[in-house]
């Protein structure tokens, strides 16, 4: 099966306009069992309440029945279960949890779409892709600004992107490279499967349920056609100066050499989004002066130091190296820093009555995860400050375990010698 997917990827990579007419049959028993094997059994269950272990008890029979229903097209996806998770701004993000059998089918579709589209996605796309991620996106922006002539940044975010993907446009984009009617039928079935919230069914006329197995791939295909291809084939050709685009899911940053071209792009971007049923989040989208000459230009106009912009939890700001030369640096964004601090504080207080050895062990796992993401060049001071805040919360929490004070500060420091907290470390170099 993997050999066939590799062959599809080769055709997609070497053909100018590949069209795939027969790929639906790849969703057979072998692929379905492989998808079952790869799925994380600890994830939340859908409306059917079926877990991976329960489905696997009669795996051969279940898979055979599933594939037969796919073949005769009697298969019908179940609605996704709507749940909410908190966002940094205090609001809640809706997620759609598919039933277990739907997760299997969605992963199979994702594999096929991945073989077709991964070779065709542009290098400026970093979200939900193999061997690419947040750090690579941050590094790309750093290098473009450091070594190029970029002087203006358009930082944009799409309002409710996953909830407003237009189904008809989505299908048109897919039909550009896929003319297998059966696969298109299945994808449309999922787009229209609906959601179940508090026992009430709601149809889905637009959007792709965030949290589903297939949703990130569909989102990338949508952004590929709406944004990145447009930037490459239209925007770049109209520009006289340097420009670049870095995209991660619904978040993206564009850089320009000239202000007039940045303003032109920003205006056309809004119109482009509206054409495909999308809207920029006004509070998170803006054009700023940022780059090698931003500070001296603003000083000459009697203005304050250059503005900053946030991307993927980091704040970019104009700075200097040891020789006095320009360098764009990054640090944990204030919003993400405070969000993480609150989360750690709540966890520490909720777990303060557990044995110290257990608390430190689990806390270190969390801290190392924090360092692995935020431990990038120039951000060591910020992650060190984060550790100090965590230590303070831990000290206060330990002294609330009983009526009497459990530790003096010196005693607490001595205790940390026996149960040390993980030390900050820079894991990722941006240059």
PLM-predicted stretches and their roles:
Residues 1-23, 30:
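Charged, compositionally biased N-terminal leader segments and the immediate start
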Residues 27-33, 79-81, 88, 191, ...:
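Core structural elements
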Residues 33-92:
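Phosphate/adenylate-binding "loop-and-lid" substructures adjacent to NTP/NAD/dNTP-binding pockets
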Residues 69-84, 88, 120-290:
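Conserved polymerase palm-domain catalytic core
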Residues 125, 203-208, 327-329, 345-359, ...:
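Short, solvent-exposed helix-loop connector elements
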Residues 192, 280-355:
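A conserved non-catalytic segment of reverse transcriptases
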Residues 244-248, 285-293, 363-366, 383-391, ...:
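A glycine-rich phosphate-binding loop feature that marks nucleotide/adenosyl-phosphate handling sites
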Residues 380-431:
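A terminal-accessory region detector
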